[in-house]
Design a protein with these regions (language model features):
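Short alpha-helical segment of the dimerization/phosphotransfer core of two-component systems
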Residues: 44-49
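Conserved micro-motifs of the catalytic ATP-binding
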Residues: 64-69, 102, 106-109
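Short helix-loop "hinge" at the ATP-lid/N-box region of the Bergerat-fold HATPase_c
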Residues: 125-126
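Short beta-strand/loop element within the Bergerat-fold HATPase_c
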Residues: 132-144
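Acidic ATP/Mg2+-coordinating residue in the GHKL
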Residues: 152
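Conserved glycine-rich
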Residues: 196-198
Length: 218
């Protein structure tokens, strides 16, 4: 199955890139409103397909050990800043207050992969938080672990679905009104586990969610 995923990724990379390019070129033309909407929809779906293929490849490589992590003692501040900067435009577009508490904490982690895991958590938080809501990032150290929280004022997740949302392609009932492929949380948990950490959620319908990423300090 992993060989199949790799082959699919290789064969679809150029067609997807061409779709995105043509959609972007169309959107720059002086077209009727209906045609502009079609071009925007084409670009959105091509981007979604690109993200899905890339995510499948990443999870496949993580599961087989092909894509290795290189944990080292790292400052969390630049890692958090990297992840937050990537979702800031989306948050601003929805009028969501995105805040991050400065931290002097450090953890034994792979900075690149940790930023990827946090980006997935933040992207979901912004996606499922209504306009005008809040998303906050904060961290805290314990004796052996460092904890990074991504808290939102979004729709929340029923208790019966909280264990299922970390499964590949699973999407909670409340999530179907939003775009997504159901792989971000699975990938984030794989990244956490690959570094000797773990990921958990605390949530309730109508009360938002807090995803906590635990990473070893040494």
């Amino acid at each position: 199955i992993n060989t199949l995923i790799a082959d699919i990724s290789h064969q679809t990379k150029t067609p997807i890139a061409n779709l995105l390019l043509y959609a972007q070129l169309l959107s720059e033309q002086d077209l009727p409103q209906d045609s502009r909407r079609c071009a925007a929809a084409l670009e959105q779906q091509a981007e979604k397909l690109r993200f899905l293929v890339e995510s499948l490849v990443k999870t496949s490589r993580l599961e087989t050990g092909i894509l290795e992590m290189h944990p080292k003692l790292s400052s969390l501040q630049p890692i958090l800043e990297d992840a937050v900067s990537q979702v800031t435009p989306k948050a601003e577009a929805k009028g969501i207050a995105l805040t991050m508490e400065p931290t002097g904490e450090g953890a034994l982690c792979d900075p690149k992969w940790t930023a990827e895991a946090l980006y997935n958590l933040l992207d979901n938080a912004v996606k499922y938080t209504p306009a005008g809501g809040k998303v906050a990032v904060r961290s805290k150290s314990y004796d052996f672990f460092c904890r990074i929280d991504v808290a939102d004022t979004g729709t929340g997740i029923p208790e019966g679905e909280q264990a299922k949302i970390f499964q590949r392609f699973y999407r909670a009932d409340s999530a179907y009104q939003e775009e997504g492929v159901g792989i971000g949380l699975y990938l984030s948990r794989q990244i956490a586990a690959g570094q000797g950490g773990y990921l958990k959620v605390s949530s309730a319908p109508g009360k938002g969610s807090t995803f906590s990423l635990f990473l070893p300090r040494r």
